[in-house]
Amino acid sequence: TDARFHAPIIPMLCALLLVSASCAAAADWISPGGAGSYAVTKPADGKKPDNGTVKMTLPAIGPNVDAAGKRKVPTSDWWTPLAWLDPADLPDRPAGMKAQRHGLSWQVFSEPLVFQPQKGGLAVSLNCPDSRRAGMKGDVLTAGAGFMQEVVGVESKGISPYFNAFFDQDLYLGSTLSGWNEAAYAGVKVTGWSDWFVNFSMTSAAETMSVTAGNGSPFLLVKLAKGAPQVTFQSWNIGKVVPLEGDSFQVNSGMANGQKIDSPSFAVINQVPFGKAWLPDDNTVSKDYSTYTVYAVFGPAGSTWTLDKGQKDDGRVLNTAVCSGGTHYAAAVLPCPWGKTIYDEPSEADIRKLLATFASHAFAEVTDTRVAPQLSGSSVTASFTYTTAPVAGESPSGDGTLYAMYPHQYLDQSVTILDRSMGRTGSSSWTNGWCWPSLKGPMLLASGKGFSNTYDVPPCLPAVIDEPDAAKADRMVALVRQALDTQDPNFLSQGSYFGAQEIHRLAMLLPVSEMIRGAATNPASADSAAKAVYKRAAETLGYRLRATPDDGTTLKNAAQHALYYDSRWGTMIPSCEDGFAADSLLNDHHYHFGYFVKTATEIARWEKTHPSDPDNAGWAAAYAPMVRLLIRDIANTDRTGTGADPDFPFLRHFSPYAGHSWASGSSRGNQGGQQESTSEAIQAWAALLLWAQLNYPADASNAELEKWAAYMFASEVRAAELYWFGYTTNAAFRPFLSFRQYAAKSDAVPKPYVPSMVSQINQNEMTFQTDFGNPPLLKHGIQWLPLTGSSLYLGVNGGALAEQDVKGYLETDWPKLGAGQTPPS
């Protein structure tokens, strides 16, 4: 072969190979601008210094959605179990369970309702704690699964209260073509959503059933493709039907078949008898009791219903109501008058009054829901708006919809509720309203096209420090130096949770160093310490915000901490060395990235304060684009979607109607949304607020971010006070709030076991325990730490702090925890 032919080709081939390698590398990561970058190819497994393997595990499935538009699907929301639907991870189906009750998803908590798509239809129940129901858990006699006492281990030798609600499956919504008896539904798909409402469909070979549900909505609106409305309800042999028009009648076993209901609307009183409720004050005494739940069904205008197919199922009596025509209907759970509970038999007069009001709103279909915050000085107002449209062929009331308000929405707020005569009254008259029981406290009935809540924005500072004298300033300079010298590099290199916490500790030293510089006897030494903190924080966080190692030519492996963008879910995923399923289930992103944002803010603050300092590396300008992506991951304020990646869902963690965040990404399991640490959620929203207010480098998005961050910060603080700490200044309401409502029932809960707070709230349970241990210090600490300049809400009321009985923990346990010991308490 002629060598002259090869001579020019060889350099060309080498150049092509280099270009090809460069293109392949560039395709593995993307920079949003500046020095930061993120991976778009999953990082390979890597090794830690101790030779342990670190891997990134991506979500097993993508969104279960069939919806128009460009939006990314929310996670960490009340309806997420419908979107995060993994066929390999569905509820257990015990041997002998009827096919009708096989779940097509996990339970979904809209509150006051809970529902679950099943093969036999949409199973529905009131999400209600029954604190009298007897039961066992772990061989421990309880006052019921409604109030469980869990022995939490030898280390604490204590009892951990555990409050939860039940899914009794009182109604099954379906159609004449696919209902309870056919057990034919095979799939469920999300078809649309707004800020706190969702649309989904259930399909069988013969039917498509479309459902509209909302957080705080007592209604479920159903539209059918082909069949007529059909509802199966349980009556436990002693139920009663109350039509809107006509006489009521019993539905005892075998008596209901063929019974006509000559009204489009009727209610069912579901009386469930129980026996031998355990009385903590006297274990020898037992007491029979019943619970009463009232459900309402609304057929098309001019329709009637016929009861058919009465049958027994697992001790229950089931009756099926078939509608005379139409392809739409609605179901609802009715409230009780204030002062009555699920243990009190409801009056027919109240039921008919409620039926009339609910019937006039049942077919005002909610087509959109929106929350809009406005910041004014030190307060923020959030407006909640419903958009409704009449279902075809119906003429609902024109004043909007009915909704159930949580305590944070009506307590000490200028909103209206419906009183006992169905007129509007101020929420300060809550004892004259209608309510549903809930774990968080009574939910009040209200109507309209929306409402507004106003909250004071708590103090939010970069750090908390007094004005030190020279001696104190000098000591603090030495402590800053000591913190730098003793920092464990292995701990600093941990994953996206503990590593982020350690970087955050560095960042918290920056404002402290700035504050003490002027008082120190040697300002140069203080300045040197501050610069050392700045450099280490900037270098460490900068490394975390790059997808490549320092050479910039290859993609990091999972042990080197690259952030990977998952276009299916629209999220930045960290490697899961210590991430508590932040990768595979998208848990806790607001915790992890909140620490990153706070660190970035303090680095930027130092640079803004020292623009001409020769040590100013321009970190903020270089990494602000990546910081903004992390902010959008946890708190994107755009609903419409850009249609181009990277894009993110609207408010990933913060649930506007609930008033706080949910930390669980998938909400899998039958507990629904879950959040343990309110303090870390609050820290995240405070970090966003400080970043927006600092506005360095200046960016137009920060003005919008500021009002949303202030709203989430203020609302999360309010929810933490009410629901996790059970605290309100309204002494009259206090016995009804959160876990305190159980303390008010001496025949249901032994008062010594009622805690001063709860450490974890799920949508169907709240517990005074943590996922990582149960000494009281840990159970309290998860609601306190990190203590920062945004933690001042914890000390707003000294009386409340004293009541939490934390003084002993601070004096005896805190030093031991700081020394790495496990406190005996």
Q: What feature does the model see in each segment?
A:
Residues 568-572, 576-580, 609-620, 624, ...:
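Flexible, surface-exposed loop/gating regions in the mature catalytic domains
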Residues 1-8:
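N-terminal secretory signal peptides that target proteins for export/translocation
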